[in-house]
Amino acid sequence: MIADTDWGTQVWHATDKVRMAKFQEVLKEHFAQPHLPRHLLPMLKDAGFTVKKVDGIVMMTTEIEPYVIGITKLAGQFIAGRHGITGGDVQEWEADLSRLNETGEYFYSANQYLFLIEKG
């Protein structure tokens, strides 16, 4: 089984939409193939695998929880210092997410795809 997230499916609500879009674009640089799932079927077939099943899981939350705290911290560490994004920008973003959480407006979602495969 192969599991991977297509980072183009990520929805992360923030008050500053322009900043959020920039952060998400810069974060994609962290991944060798941020959109791998949409290209994986032909790659697997070309490598001699049979794809038995493909399924998806929506990872979604309407409140800040440990998984999202981890993603937020890792994202902030990666994007700070890239493309003009400062540590202060990241702190403002984190504060915005916290405010949205406090007011019940927080929303995060991303799709993970599962490929059940066998050789031959």
Which residue stretches match the model-derived regions?
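Conserved catalytic/acceptor-binding region of the Class I
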Residues: 2-64
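General N-terminal targeting signals
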Residues: 17-19, 24, 66-71, 110, ...
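Aromatic-acidic/polar surface patches that form glycan- and anion
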Residues: 33, 106-107
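Short coil/turn segments at secondary-structure boundaries
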Residues: 40-41, 89-91, 109-113
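Core SAM-dependent methyltransferase catalytic element
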Residues: 47-50, 70-74, 108-120
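C-terminal helical/coil "lid" or tail adjacent to the Rossmann-like core of SAM-dependent
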Residues: 51-106
